Regions:
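Conserved donor nucleotide-binding strand/loop of the catalytic core
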Residues: 5-11
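Active-site-adjacent beta->alpha loops and helix N-cap segments on the catalytic face
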Residues: 49
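Short, acidic/glycine-rich phosphate-metal binding loop used to engage nucleotide
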Residues: 11-13, 70
Length: 174
Protein backbone atom coordinates (compact mmCIF):
# COMPACT_ATOMS: atom_id res chain seq x y z
CA UNK A 1 0.00 0.00 0.00
CA UNK A 2 1.50 3.32 -1.05
CA UNK A 3 -0.34 5.76 1.19
CA UNK A 4 -0.43 4.92 4.87
CA UNK A 5 -1.23 8.28 6.39
CA UNK A 6 -1.25 12.01 5.89
CA UNK A 7 0.87 14.11 8.22
CA UNK A 8 -0.34 17.58 9.07
CA UNK A 9 0.45 20.24 11.64
CA UNK A 10 -2.23 22.74 10.67
CA UNK A 11 -1.90 26.10 8.98
CA UNK A 12 0.13 28.07 11.50
CA UNK A 13 3.53 26.54 10.81
CA UNK A 14 6.27 27.25 8.32
CA UNK A 15 6.29 24.75 5.43
CA UNK A 16 9.96 23.89 6.09
CA UNK A 17 9.14 22.98 9.70
CA UNK A 18 6.20 20.85 8.57
CA UNK A 19 8.45 19.07 6.04
CA UNK A 20 11.07 18.35 8.70
CA UNK A 21 8.48 17.08 11.18
CA UNK A 22 6.83 14.93 8.48
CA UNK A 23 10.12 13.21 7.67
CA UNK A 24 10.85 12.63 11.36
CA UNK A 25 7.33 11.21 11.80
CA UNK A 26 7.80 8.89 8.80
CA UNK A 27 11.13 7.63 10.10
CA UNK A 28 9.67 6.92 13.55
CA UNK A 29 6.82 4.98 11.96
CA UNK A 30 8.94 2.93 9.56
CA UNK A 31 7.89 4.68 6.38
CA UNK A 32 10.51 4.86 3.65
CA UNK A 33 8.67 7.24 1.35
CA UNK A 34 7.53 10.77 2.08
CA UNK A 35 5.77 12.93 -0.47
CA UNK A 36 5.89 16.63 0.35
CA UNK A 37 3.03 18.29 -1.49
CA UNK A 38 3.29 22.06 -1.39
CA UNK A 39 0.77 24.74 -2.31
CA UNK A 40 -0.07 24.95 -5.99
CA UNK A 41 1.04 27.89 -8.09
CA UNK A 42 -0.22 28.96 -11.50
CA UNK A 43 2.17 31.89 -11.63
CA UNK A 44 5.47 32.72 -9.98
CA UNK A 45 4.99 33.94 -6.41
CA UNK A 46 8.26 35.04 -4.78
CA UNK A 47 7.09 34.29 -1.22
CA UNK A 48 6.09 30.75 -2.14
CA UNK A 49 9.31 30.24 -4.09
CA UNK A 50 11.24 31.31 -0.97
CA UNK A 51 9.27 28.71 1.02
CA UNK A 52 10.32 26.01 -1.45
CA UNK A 53 13.95 27.07 -1.25
CA UNK A 54 13.73 26.93 2.55
CA UNK A 55 12.27 23.40 2.41
CA UNK A 56 15.11 22.24 0.15
CA UNK A 57 17.64 23.80 2.55
CA UNK A 58 15.99 22.22 5.62
CA UNK A 59 15.41 18.61 4.55
CA UNK A 60 17.13 16.18 2.21
CA UNK A 61 15.02 15.90 -0.90
CA UNK A 62 15.69 12.95 -3.18
CA UNK A 63 13.54 14.05 -6.08
CA UNK A 64 11.67 17.22 -6.97
CA UNK A 65 8.76 16.81 -9.34
CA UNK A 66 6.98 19.84 -10.75
CA UNK A 67 3.28 19.39 -11.46
CA UNK A 68 2.13 21.62 -14.31
CA UNK A 69 -1.49 22.39 -15.24
CA UNK A 70 -1.79 21.91 -19.02
CA UNK A 71 -4.58 24.49 -19.12
CA UNK A 72 -2.16 27.30 -18.22
CA UNK A 73 -0.77 26.98 -21.74
CA UNK A 74 2.55 28.54 -22.54
CA UNK A 75 2.70 30.29 -19.14
CA UNK A 76 3.60 26.82 -17.84
CA UNK A 77 6.97 27.30 -19.56
CA UNK A 78 7.73 30.38 -17.45
CA UNK A 79 6.73 28.58 -14.26
CA UNK A 80 8.83 25.52 -15.12
CA UNK A 81 11.87 27.61 -16.01
CA UNK A 82 11.66 29.61 -12.78
CA UNK A 83 11.15 26.50 -10.65
CA UNK A 84 14.08 24.74 -12.26
CA UNK A 85 16.35 27.76 -11.79
CA UNK A 86 15.33 28.37 -8.15
CA UNK A 87 14.98 24.88 -6.69
CA UNK A 88 15.99 22.39 -9.38
CA UNK A 89 13.41 20.12 -10.94
CA UNK A 90 14.07 16.43 -11.65
CA UNK A 91 10.93 15.73 -13.65
CA UNK A 92 7.49 17.00 -14.61
CA UNK A 93 3.91 15.76 -14.35
CA UNK A 94 1.41 17.48 -16.67
CA UNK A 95 -2.19 17.46 -15.42
CA UNK A 96 -5.61 18.23 -16.89
CA UNK A 97 -4.94 16.60 -20.23
CA UNK A 98 -8.37 14.96 -20.05
CA UNK A 99 -9.98 18.16 -21.36
CA UNK A 100 -9.66 19.79 -24.73
CA UNK A 101 -6.15 21.08 -24.10
CA UNK A 102 -3.77 19.61 -26.65
CA UNK A 103 -0.71 19.74 -24.41
CA UNK A 104 1.76 21.82 -26.39
CA UNK A 105 2.98 23.35 -23.15
CA UNK A 106 4.23 19.90 -22.09
CA UNK A 107 6.74 19.73 -24.91
CA UNK A 108 7.74 23.36 -24.37
CA UNK A 109 8.40 22.67 -20.68
CA UNK A 110 10.58 19.72 -21.67
CA UNK A 111 12.48 21.84 -24.19
CA UNK A 112 13.08 24.72 -21.75
CA UNK A 113 14.05 22.68 -18.68
CA UNK A 114 15.57 19.62 -20.33
CA UNK A 115 13.77 17.58 -17.65
CA UNK A 116 11.68 14.51 -18.50
CA UNK A 117 7.91 14.48 -18.45
CA UNK A 118 7.22 11.52 -16.20
CA UNK A 119 3.44 11.26 -16.16
CA UNK A 120 0.31 12.91 -17.48
CA UNK A 121 -2.92 13.39 -15.57
CA UNK A 122 -5.98 12.29 -17.52
CA UNK A 123 -8.54 12.82 -14.74
CA UNK A 124 -8.89 13.55 -11.05
CA UNK A 125 -8.17 10.11 -9.59
CA UNK A 126 -4.79 8.59 -8.81
CA UNK A 127 -5.60 5.85 -11.32
CA UNK A 128 -5.87 8.56 -14.01
CA UNK A 129 -2.13 9.23 -13.80
CA UNK A 130 -0.56 7.69 -16.91
CA UNK A 131 2.98 7.21 -18.12
CA UNK A 132 4.03 9.87 -20.62
CA UNK A 133 4.62 8.81 -24.21
CA UNK A 134 6.16 11.57 -26.40
CA UNK A 135 4.85 10.12 -29.67
CA UNK A 136 1.29 10.05 -28.35
CA UNK A 137 1.60 13.65 -27.16
CA UNK A 138 2.89 14.69 -30.59
CA UNK A 139 -0.13 13.04 -32.24
CA UNK A 140 -2.44 14.83 -29.83
CA UNK A 141 -0.81 18.20 -30.50
CA UNK A 142 -1.08 17.64 -34.25
CA UNK A 143 -4.79 16.90 -33.83
CA UNK A 144 -4.42 13.23 -34.69
CA UNK A 145 -5.68 12.02 -31.31
CA UNK A 146 -4.20 9.41 -29.06
CA UNK A 147 -5.51 6.19 -30.54
CA UNK A 148 -3.13 3.91 -28.61
CA UNK A 149 -4.27 5.20 -25.22
CA UNK A 150 -7.89 4.79 -26.31
CA UNK A 151 -7.19 1.18 -27.35
CA UNK A 152 -5.42 0.47 -24.03
CA UNK A 153 -8.38 1.83 -22.06
CA UNK A 154 -10.82 -0.25 -24.11
CA UNK A 155 -8.70 -3.38 -23.56
CA UNK A 156 -8.57 -2.72 -19.82
CA UNK A 157 -12.37 -2.36 -19.73
CA UNK A 158 -12.76 -5.59 -21.69
CA UNK A 159 -10.48 -7.38 -19.23
CA UNK A 160 -12.57 -6.10 -16.32
CA UNK A 161 -15.81 -7.14 -18.06
CA UNK A 162 -14.32 -10.57 -18.83
CA UNK A 163 -13.30 -11.03 -15.18
CA UNK A 164 -16.81 -10.06 -14.05
CA UNK A 165 -18.35 -12.52 -16.52
CA UNK A 166 -16.10 -15.34 -15.28
CA UNK A 167 -17.01 -14.55 -11.68
CA UNK A 168 -20.72 -14.46 -12.57
CA UNK A 169 -20.42 -17.83 -14.38
CA UNK A 170 -18.57 -19.32 -11.41
CA UNK A 171 -21.29 -18.20 -9.01
CA UNK A 172 -24.09 -19.52 -11.22
CA UNK A 173 -22.55 -23.02 -11.24
CA UNK A 174 -22.65 -23.23 -7.44
Amino acid sequence: MLFRSVFTMGDNHKPANIAKAAIEHAQKNGNNLVILDTAGRLHIDEDMMAELEEIKNTVTVHQTILVIDAMTGQDAVNVAKEFDEKIGVDGVIVTKLDGDTRGGAALSVKAVTGKPILYVGMGEKLSDLEQFYPDRMANRILGMGDVLSLIEKAEAELDIDEDKAKERDRKSVV
